[in-house]
Amino acid sequence: QRKDFCFKIVMEDEKGVIALELHTYNDYLRDLLKDAPCILAYDTAADYLGLSNGSSFHETAHIYVQSPLHIDGTTEHLIPSFSAVEHERRNGLLCTTVNQTINDLLRADGDNQVIQESLADVYFSNGESFDSLQIEQDLLPRFEKYKVWAMEYYDEE
């Protein structure tokens, strides 16, 4: 079972030529979930969207599902309908939007590093502003806490 960020495949053809292929985590997700009725969620969505630097070790891929799929290597989060979360098709897979991903990360209050990096990416990608986000009312106190760290995330001081 694949749990690292990327792996390399070395192949030799009939002429002895060696080829090197880089298989990224996003490639792995596309292979794993290409035909599955699911939406990438939480840390997995943040990685896939490029909001966080990712991790060199992925325990499982977090996905929203409407009914259990029992896919090895995933953690399934049941939702009544895909319309319950903001999502879009991105490079072949359904994934929560940036806004939904940020709200989900704040609600789960999971990996601080992923939350900080994701907020920092939004902040610096939008001209040092969080105006592109619509944070749910009950998550505003948590957002205020993380936002300060995110604004200073890339400072070298």
Which sequence ranges carry the predicted segments?
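Short gly/ser-rich loop at a beta-strand->alpha-helix junction or flexible surface loop bordering the NTP-binding
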Residues: 1-89, 128
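Hydrophobic alpha-helical interaction segments
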Residues: 53-54, 58, 69, 78-157
